[in-house]
Amino acid sequence: MSIRILPENEIKQAASSFQNPPLLFANPKNLYFRRAKRLRQLAENNPFGDYLEFAANLSEVQLDLLENHPIANYAEKLTACIEESNGQKPLNAKTFKRSSEWRELLLLLTEKFKPYANDTMLATIELLEKSSTSELEALADDLLNERYEAVGADKAVFLWAALSLYWTQLAQQLPRNTQTEVGERHTCPVCDSAPIVSVVHFGDTQGLRYLHCSLCESEWNMVRSQCSVCDQSGKLDYWSIDSVDAPVKAESCGDCESYLKVLYQEKDPHVEPVADDLGTLFLDAEMEQKGFARSGLNPFLFQVE
């Protein structure tokens, strides 16, 4: 899938036809605030409550840095980047040339997180702080290219938090008159990263399914009742632990034997991709027992072999 900048006449035409937006950009301030709040809510009476609190604290640090240490303005450069690449995932995490700002965000993030960290986390933070520029860039390359075992789950969470904060702000600077083109929809059309979950919206986009990016936090539309990995639709099943009306379900595909969680805003308007994914880890355990492999990537849950 690619994105392109719409000319003014097409913008007016799309608006007049009530066209469903194929690409939604995040509101970072609201996103981090809602995420932290939801994580704390789900942490109550959850056996993984301590980890949800950890994720909430880190999300609040991200919000702090967003408000007080924003990245530079690259809007003109990014617009040119879309045109030069013909809209082919302009912020592709595997090829986009990062500035040093992500490393600055990492150091600020780890410093601000120290009051919440236990001894194990402090040891990880110390390793990151002592790493050279080349070592940090190598870790980022491994992480963004899905070589998680080369990074380690302990370091990956902090690295991804900084990288995601950087990429989310970059995505905010893309022209708003952009639209996705028809094509491969398995990964984010902005940065080529995997989704965390899919979300079935309510409100203006009632009933539409969007996949939520694990890196730049953008969302892109994908039709329902179609596997987000292999595009097949003949062997899809939906699973939940509590009830058939649960706000979080797992969509499994018998063709490729993968699954991705689905959040239903109509069932619970407060569902949030990262938080509700972490809050339903027992559902992951059930799906793995049934022989399905997780296709979503949660930035607080890196699977390292």
UniProtKB/Swiss-Prot annotation:
<dbReference type="InterPro" id="IPR056774">
    <property type="entry name" value="FdhE_N"/>
</dbReference>
<protein>
    <recommendedName>
        <fullName>Protein FdhE homolog</fullName>
    </recommendedName>
</protein>
<comment type="function">
    <text>Necessary for formate dehydrogenase activity.</text>
</comment>
<dbReference type="InterPro" id="IPR056797">
    <property type="entry name" value="FdhE_central"/>
</dbReference>
<dbReference type="InterPro" id="IPR006452">
    <property type="entry name" value="Formate_DH_accessory"/>
</dbReference>
<dbReference type="Pfam" id="PF04216">
    <property type="entry name" value="FdhE_N"/>
</dbReference>
<dbReference type="Pfam" id="PF24859">
    <property type="entry name" value="FdhE_central"/>
</dbReference>
<dbReference type="GO" id="GO:0005829">
    <property type="term" value="C:cytosol"/>
</dbReference>
<keyword id="KW-0963">Cytoplasm</keyword>
<dbReference type="GO" id="GO:0008199">
    <property type="term" value="F:ferric iron binding"/>
</dbReference>
<dbReference type="Pfam" id="PF24860">
    <property type="entry name" value="FdhE_C"/>
</dbReference>
<comment type="similarity">
    <text>Belongs to the FdhE family.</text>
</comment>
<dbReference type="GO" id="GO:0051604">
    <property type="term" value="P:protein maturation"/>
</dbReference>
<dbReference type="InterPro" id="IPR056796">
    <property type="entry name" value="FdhE_C"/>
</dbReference>
<dbReference type="InterPro" id="IPR024064">
    <property type="entry name" value="FdhE-like_sf"/>
</dbReference>
